[in-house]
Regions:
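Conserved structured core elements
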Residues: 91, 164, 217, 250-254
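Generic, well-ordered alpha-helical scaffold segments in large soluble proteins
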Residues: 100, 169-176, 222, 226, ...
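N-terminal low-structure segments adjacent to metalloprotease catalytic domains
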Residues: 1-135
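Contiguous, non-catalytic segments that form substrate-binding/exosite surfaces or channel walls
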Residues: 80-210
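Post-HExxH zinc-binding segment in Zn-dependent metallohydrolases
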Residues: 243-265
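Short helix/strand-bridging catalytic loops that position acidic/His residues to coordinate divalent metals
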Residues: 204-213, 236-248
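Active-site recognition of the HExxH zinc-binding catalytic motif
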Residues: 216-231
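N-terminal accessory/precursor segments of enzymes
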Residues: 228-235, 252
Length: 265
């Protein structure tokens, strides 16, 4: 028999309600989905780039009205005490979502850079602990990856795995780790990236070839970082927003996912 959960204290109960309001307010804000190019535009751009004919596509970004979202975020933020640990967490999370909506207001214009910088930083900014810069750190890992690629190229099979095979193999491995039916691996013809993950679903781009190395990277990157983080957040009894994350956690999430690829080989 499971032990009943202890009742929340007054502060925790209040912040749990504010967190629920935050989650409800940003439910329709899809940052990556809103700024992604259509698959056809991406393919045309890359095809031109490969033959030295670089031409930027003209993208018609869908416009949204986020005024009500920002109003609710401001109300939640105002109700938080920034000196309280949960209050500070909600304050920073509301702020990052508000910046994200401002970015989406101006997507497709040069003004997007200012909001993107506030969310994700700049290449020349120093990492905590007196550096290096983001760019220098990235180049360091690129060099390590290049060395690894040279070693792996000797052993990497020349054949390409179809998306359907990778889907089946990943599903088997994921079922063995998370439990059967907990996380589904699906094919998506509209996906821009090769893969994307949520707490309960990992999508692979249809009609795309994968290498053996790709398959292993996907397991580490998508399943063991993004999906596992989301599932862990869902187990948090007070702050449901941890299941989704926020724009301010993107850099950490992607950094962990990329590092997991490299550490696992």
């Amino acid at each position: 028999m499971s032990t009943p959960a202890a009742p929340l204290d007054k502060d925790a109960a209040r912040y749990a309600e504010l967190d629920r309001r935050l989650v409800a307010a940003v439910r329709g804000v899809r940052l990556l989905e809103s700024v992604s190019w259509p698959a056809a535009a991406q393919e045309k751009f890359l095809a031109g780039w490969r033959v030295g004919k670089l031409a930027m596509p003209v993208i018609e970004y869908r416009k949204h009205d986020f005024a009500a979202v920002r109003e609710e975020l401001a109300a939640v933020e105002k109700a938080c005490d920034p000196a309280h640990p949960i209050g500070r967490y909600l304050h920073l999370t509301c702020e990052s979502w508000r910046i994200a909506t401002r970015l989406l207001d101006v997507v497709g214009t040069h003004r997007v850079t200012a909001f993107s910088t506030r969310l994700f930083g700049r290449p020349v900014e120093m990492l905590p602990g007196e550096g290096p810069t983001n760019l220098e750190a990235a180049m360091h890992f690129v060099e390590l990856a290049d060395e690894l690629d040279q070693e792996l190229s000797t052993y990497e099979p020349a054949y390409v795995l179809p998306a359907e095979q990778v889907q089946a193999e990943l599903q088997e491995q994921i079922d063995g780790f998370f439990g059967v039916g907990e996380v589904k691996v699906e094919l998506d013809p509209t996906l821009i990236a090769k893969a994307a993950a949520s707490p309960t679903r990992i999508r692979l781009r249809t009609n795309t070839g994968f290498s053996e190395y790709d398959r292993n990277q996907l397991l580490m990157h998508e399943a063991y970082v993004h999906t596992l983080t989301g599932l862990n957040g869902r187990q948090q009894p007070v702050l449901g927003s941890l299941a989704r994350g926020s724009p301010r956690t993107t850099a950490t999430q992607e950094g962990l996912a990329t590092l997991s690829e490299m550490m696992s080989g």
